[in-house]
């Protein structure tokens, strides 16, 4: 049935209902996940896709880097496993950084949804597993295979029967076998819940197919975004952002072109790929660039294949923003999450009254690893990622947000959760006074955190931070934000990137 045969009001109701379906999918993932970074912080994505791979709806809960790159993952799944070969009860999995969401820690599971024996849609989801073997989270690897288990596109479940061989491989290649396997099951479960709710919706609205609704969603969204772009002045706008990198600074160079009803962003001139694990696969570059554009151009339009269609993103292969296999990519967020601010620097020239100043941009996740007990024969290790944020840039008509993860959108991990799941103690967690750049509206404040072992033992800090040498810049005459830093409370500095030991009795201090 065509969209015109259903009626606009009914289509709009079904669109909103579909968004609620995928939001329940995401909430199921949060409520069943084992890793605190998922269940407490929402480092995930969830969405429903047409049989042709178009994204029809995404959950409100989730990160842009996962959602927009997961949309590409579904297309890869369909190329490997055509829809006509899928059966009810099948599920497919990968953590391939170039076909998934940018690094090995993110597992993507895609599941076909059947109704009355016929495939109706695909549900897909992503979440971050804290430990997947290898060197662990950080920048130290020099190729992707050092960073953990690498799962190609495989069948996780065949007609409802789980692939126990694959699960055994996952368990054996992680320092957290119970948590990792549990997270895989939570991903599969959330897709199943999404399918159940979709079938209920289709029964309620007497739908035999999602084609008409999907066409309406994508066509309506694309037209709305193109109309908004058409209100901006045509032109070519350039911006360069310099950030810390590893060893040498990195230049992120963007040329944004507005031409009638479309926007292209080209990163030609950006620094080459790094020998360390801060490289970014193209899908992740596209995801965060599109998110930055959407925030200014189409913030009130739901995210789907149609709303993304007017944006075209490119970066020369071999640059840090289009790093080919087997480049190390574990900490790709350190670079990729800068890209909305890079695109804002371009858009500020076309729409100066709508664009915020630069913020902390990338997360300041405090990833720690060590023994759970001081006993020398204790073989059980803890691995934890305490999600931590700086502040956002000042907005055109109000201050920036303090201690807020933008652009990732994840929540900070509560201190109580960190101290419950790992033998660490937080002596301090508070706003960092005067850290937001001054101006008519100031930037959001960062944080001060102080952390020590709770059992008098050494532990490792897997550092991957930025904005230390090159702080966030103000806009339109506003002041820069304060630079980040990390050190011991006794004064000795710690490196912004790289695995380091925090000795027993020492307190590590972080200024975001």
Locate the predicted segments by residue.
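Glycine/proline-enriched, intrinsically flexible loops and inter-domain linkers
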Residues: 1-88, 93-512
């Amino acid at each position: 049935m065509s969209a015109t045969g259903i009626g606009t009001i009914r289509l709009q109701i079904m669109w909103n209902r579909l968004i609620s379906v995928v939001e329940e999918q995401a909430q199921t993932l949060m409520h069943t996940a084992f890793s605190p970074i998922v269940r407490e912080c929402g480092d995930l994505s969830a969405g429903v896709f047409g049989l042709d791979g178009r994204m029809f709806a995404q959950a409100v809960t989730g990160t842009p880097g996962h959602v927009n790159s997961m949309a590409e993952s579904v297309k890869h799944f369909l190329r490997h496993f055509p829809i006509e070969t899928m059966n009810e009860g099948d599920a497919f999995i990968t953590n391939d950084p170039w076909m998934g969401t940018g690094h090995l820690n993110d597992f993507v599971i895609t599941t076909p949804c059947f109704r009355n024996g016929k495939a109706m849609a695909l549900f897909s989801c992503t979440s971050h597993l804290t430990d997947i073997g290898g060197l662990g989270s950080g920048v130290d690897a020099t190729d992707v295979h050092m960073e953990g288990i690498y799962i190609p596109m495989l069948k996780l479940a065949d007609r409802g029967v789980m692939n126990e061989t694959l699960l055994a491989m996952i368990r054996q290649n992680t320092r957290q076998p119970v948590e990792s396997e549990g997270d895989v099951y939570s991903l599969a479960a959330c897709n199943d819940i999404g399918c159940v709710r979709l079938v209920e919706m289709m029964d309620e609205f007497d739908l035999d197919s999602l084609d008409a609704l999907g066409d309406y969603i994508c066509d309506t969204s694309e037209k709305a975004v193109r109309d908004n772009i058409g209100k901006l002045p045509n032109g070519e706008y350039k911006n360069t952002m310099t950030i810390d990198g590893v060893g040498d600074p990195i230049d992120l160079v963007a040329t944004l072109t507005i031409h009638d009803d479309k926007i292209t962003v080209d990163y030609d001139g950006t620094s080459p790929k790094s020998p360390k694990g801060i490289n970014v696969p193209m899908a992740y570059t596209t995801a965060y660039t599109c998110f930055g554009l959407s925030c200014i151009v189409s913030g009130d339009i739901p995210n789907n294949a149609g709303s993304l269609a007017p944006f075209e993103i490119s970066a020369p292969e071999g640059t840090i923003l289009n790093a080919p296999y087997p480049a190390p990519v574990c900490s790709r967020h350190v670079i990729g999450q800068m890209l909305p601010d890079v695109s804002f620097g371009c858009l500020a020239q076309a729409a100066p009254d709508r664009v915020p100043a630069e913020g902390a941009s990338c997360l300041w996740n405090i990833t720690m690893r060590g023994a759970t007990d001081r006993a020398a024969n204790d073989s059980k290790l803890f691995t934890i990622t305490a999600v931590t944020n700086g502040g956002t840039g000042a907005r055109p008509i109000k201050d920036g947000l303090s201690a807020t993860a933008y652009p990732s959108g994840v929540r900070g991990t509560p201190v109580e959760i960190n101290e419950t799941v790992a033998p660490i103690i937080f002596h301090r967690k508070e706003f960092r006074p005067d850290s937001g750049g001054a101006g008519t509206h100031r930037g959001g404040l960062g944080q001060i955190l102080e952390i020590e072992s709770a059992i008098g033992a050494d532990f490792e800090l897997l550092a991957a931070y930025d904005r230390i040498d090159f702080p966030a810049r103000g806009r339109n005459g506003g002041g820069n934000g304060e630079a980040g830093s990390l050190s011991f409370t006794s004064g000795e500095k710690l490196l912004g990137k790289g695995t380091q030991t925090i000795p027993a009795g020492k307190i590590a201090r972080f200024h975001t």
